[in-house]
A protein has these predicted regions:
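Radical SAM/AdoMet-radical enzyme domain recognition
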Residues: 1-6, 10, 14-126
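Auxiliary Fe-S-binding modules of radical SAM enzymes
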Residues: 116-120, 130-267
């Protein structure tokens, strides 16, 4: 394990997150430490996170429209999120990226505006195809605004859209040079990258998951509380990884989404 990403839910609601970051940053041979956030609490915490050793930030930004933002998130928080983005940029993190969930009927009209917003701040924007991990379990294949559709809009709106090579096979995003910046497209539904996936997840209640879409998980919390040795824990984790499916199977008949929504898995 070389990289750790803190996700949620929303990790910044946890007390003393900078202290957690500081402890993780002290792990020997750790190469990368990052965090994904909705940005609403970021303005007041960005500097402390940076000083504690956090290297990279991914910030969710699905829209720049106040009313649409409230409909998606069920709260009035767009201004706080935008303030959080600007605060993060000023802190000088190694990387700040914006993640936009691409939903048909929502994203089409804002693709160009979102890209220009990111380009104007010299940060990378990544569009992510809508996955069946929503809280309301209302996902339908027809709602997926596909990578091909996104790329078509980019090509219509910008003079030059040039594909870039992936620096690592396990990187989920296809990257494109757009104007003076980069835009990513993560085709998690229409062109999944399961063969190159090198990630595991630990949930907030101490369970290991070998895939975002896994329907089973391996609990570690009970083992730890019972006094399990490091070797016992390692054996449990290896057993979990050995059961990893070849692919998530979203496009297969009979696909069953996981019992947990995204916020309860960590994504």
């Amino acid at each position: 394990m070389r990289d750790i990403r803190i996700t949620g839910g929303e990790p910044l609601v946890r007390q003393q997150v900078p202290h957690l970051i500081e402890m993780l940053a002290g792990i020997e041979k750790l190469e990368d430490l990052s965090l994904t956030t909705n940005g609403m609490l970021l303005a007041e915490q960005a500097q402390a996170l940076h000083d504690a050793g956090l290297q990279r930030l991914n910030i969710s930004l699905d829209t720049l429209n106040k009313e649409v933002f409230e409909k998606i998130t069920r709260r009035d928080g767009l201004e706080k999120t935008l303030q959080g983005i600007d605060a993060a940029i000023k802190c000088g993190f190694k990387s700040v990226k914006l993640n936009t969930l691409a939903i048909k009927g929502v994203t089409e009209s804002e693709v160009a505006e979102l890209v220009r917003y990111a380009l104007g701040r010299n940060v990378m924007l990544r569009f992510i195809e809508f996955m069946p991990l929503d809280t309301d379990r209302a996902w339908q294949q027809e709602q997926v605004f596909t990578g091909d559709q996104l790329l078509q809009i980019l090509q219509n709106e910008f003079e030059s859209v040039v594909p870039l090579s992936r620096p690592e096979p396990s990187q989920p995003a296809e990257e494109f040079q757009v104007a003076q910046g980069r835009v990513g497209i993560i085709r998690s539904v229409t062109a999944p990258f399961c063969e190159a996936c090198n990630r595991i997840r630990i949930t907030a209640d101490g369970a290991v998951r070998n895939c975002l879409f896994a329907t089973s998980e391996t609990p570690l919390r009970g083992l730890i509380r019972a006094g399990a040795s490091d070797e016992d824990l390692l054996s449990a984790i290896r057993g979990c990884l050995a059961g990893k499916a070849k692919a998530h199977g979203i496009d297969q008949d009979g696909f069953q989404p996981p019992d947990r929504p995204m916020y309860a898995i960590g994504g």
